[in-house]
């Protein structure tokens, strides 16, 4: 499936139906008076957050959404039916912006959340509304009001409990594949991952969601490479797992590069709890492992976890560490 995390769409709610001009016509009643009904209200445009979606790709093929016009009023004081609504189904985590792409309309953060983006126009009054002591037989009615139209931006920020960050080839996709059922593309060259992947990890019978984003390189916050575009997807996570490849010549420099990019990007990423791990340790002998572990620990201020997704070494301990931070964060949110 292709990944799309930002798109522009045009929406228009339905016009209101016109009121009817009608007069009561019955046997033996010569002057029946007006009985034109009101027009129906136009359909609304809604947005709804649903599970099972993790991309906005459907909006690449349909970018115009228009609700139906309300039915016109009819004689015998019959009101027209409301026009059919239109609902845009989006992944949980989608933000809706005005056309300027900066003014937030609504943040769809929960499954089943609905929001009305555009209300349908009111139906026009039928001529029965205009009967008065001075005009017993009005022969006019109101047209329905026009619906609203606007252009909006949809921007997806995936919702996950933990986010994987690191340089390209740090082993993030391999880690995700090893601890979840996700099947990201894996190869031994930089930028194999071109879009975020989500997976559900289980440890001690507890599940949590992990997001893997494309690797960051120096200058990412300024648009170098592709990782900066996807940093928004880890803004909502509760903890970051920072993977540093054991194949790096200078593990301290690799750590500091990503740390600097997170700080420069902003969005609160630099303040998030972070677990640092030295990955791909199966490629090192014992002396090299000890030296690189010490260098990385000195750079980040705490001994790193040591993991290999190939041999499964340290994987359970890492998942437990992530789960512990996530549980603590959830408890803090509930207390607040």
From Swiss-Prot:
Keywords from the named record: Cytoplasm, GTP-binding, Hydrolase, Magnesium, Metal-binding, Nucleotide-binding
InterPro entries: G_OBG, GTP-bd, GTP-bd_Obg/CgtA, GTP1-OBG_CS, GTP1_OBG_dom, GTP1_OBG_dom_sf, OBG_GTPase, P-loop_NTPase
Domain named OBG-type G: residues: 160-327
Pfam families reported for this sequence: GTP1_OBG, MMR_HSR1
Disulfide bond sites: none
Compartments reported by the entry: Cytoplasm
GO cellular component: cytoplasm
Binding positions for GTP per the UniProt entry: 166-173, 191-195, 212-215, 279-282, 308-310
Gene3D superfamilies: GTP1/OBG domain (2.70.210.12), P-loop containing nucleotide triphosphate hydrolases (3.40.50.300)
Superkingdom per UniProt: Bacteria
Cofactor(s) demanded: Mg(2+)
Gene Ontology terms, MF aspect: GTP binding; GTPase activity; magnesium ion binding
EC numbers on record: 3.6.5.-
Annotated Obg domain residues: 1-159
CDD domains given in the database record: Obg
Binding site for Mg(2+): 173, 193
Subunit structure: Monomer.
Family: Belongs to the TRAFAC class OBG-HflX-like GTPase superfamily. OBG GTPase family.
Function: An essential GTPase which binds GTP, GDP and possibly (p)ppGpp with moderate affinity, with high nucleotide exchange rates and a fairly low GTP hydrolysis rate. Plays a role in control of the cell cycle, stress response, ribosome biogenesis and in those bacteria that undergo differentiation, in morphogenesis control.
Protein name: GTPase Obg
Organismal lineage: Bacteria, Pseudomonadati, Pseudomonadota, Alphaproteobacteria, Hyphomicrobiales
């Amino acid at each position: 499936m292709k990944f799309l995390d930002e798109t522009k769409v045009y929406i228009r709610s339905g016009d209101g139906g016109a009121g009817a001009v009608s007069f009561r016509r019955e046997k033996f009643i010569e002057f029946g008076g007006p009985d034109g009904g009101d027009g129906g209200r136009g359909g609304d445009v809604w947005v709804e957050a649903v599970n099972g979606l993790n991309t906005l790709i459907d909006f690449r093929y349909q970018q115009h959404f228009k609700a139906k016009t309300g039915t016109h009023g009819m004689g015998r004081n019959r009101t027209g039916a409301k026009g059919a609504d239109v609902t845009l189904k989006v992944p949980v985590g989608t933000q809706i912006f005005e056309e300027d792409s900066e003014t937030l309309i609504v943040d769809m953060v929960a499954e089943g959340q609905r929001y009305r983006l555009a209300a349908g126009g009111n139906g026009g009054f039928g001529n029965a509304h205009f009967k008065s002591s001075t005009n017993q037989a009005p022969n006019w009615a109101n047209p329905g009001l026009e619906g609203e139209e606007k252009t909006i931006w949809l921007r997806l920020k995936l919702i996950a409990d933990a986010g994987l960050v690191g340089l390209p080839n740090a082993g993030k996709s391999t880690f995700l594949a090893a601890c979840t059922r996700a099947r990201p593309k894996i190869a031994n060259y930089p930028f194999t991952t071109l879009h975020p992947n989500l997976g559900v990890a289980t440890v001690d019978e507890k599940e949590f969601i992990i997001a893997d984003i494309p690797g960051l390189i120096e200058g990412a916050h300024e648009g170098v490479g592709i990782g900066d575009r996807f940093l928004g997807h880890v803004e909502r996570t509760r903890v970051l797992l920072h993977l540093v490849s054991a194949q790096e010549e200078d593990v301290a420099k690799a750590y500091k590069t990503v740390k600097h990019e997170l700080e420069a990007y902003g969005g609160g990423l630099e303040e998030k709890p972070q677990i640092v791990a030295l990955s791909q340790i199966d490629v090192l002998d014992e002396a090299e492992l000890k030296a690189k572990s010490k260098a990385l620990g000195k750079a980040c201020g705490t001994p790193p976890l040591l993991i290999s997704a190939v041999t499964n070494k340290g994987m359970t301990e890492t998942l437990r560490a992530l789960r512990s931070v996530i549980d603590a964060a959830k408890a803090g949110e509930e207390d607040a």
